Amino acid sequence: MGANVIKIEQPPYGDPNRSSRPRINRRAGAHIQQNRGKQSLCIDINTDSGSKLIRELVNHVDVVVENFSPGVMNNKGLGYETLAAIKPDIIMASISGFGQIGTLASQPCFDLVAQGYTGL
């Protein structure tokens, strides 16, 4: 069991976690832990060519998982309706820290922000 995971990272340097410490054999320990077994591609989805490349990749995947604020994927031409028109059996999971609707839905959220809001 398992999945072939392609992680899309922002150019030019990819995931900022790659440069975090501590280092293990010159690689960031947290990056190794969180991305073990994943393939990574740097694609700028803010460009037409980047969005086009993502739409081409959809033909080769079963699931798209995204964690942008609600509406970002639609605004980039990469929403569920667009991707499902390309590959009708695509599964898409949209994960956001404050949900898809509500007063805080448009706010970005990461682990430390969620911990602060919940009192951890």
Task: Name these PLM-found stretches.
Residues 1-120:
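N-terminal helix-loop segment corresponding to the beta1-alpha1 unit
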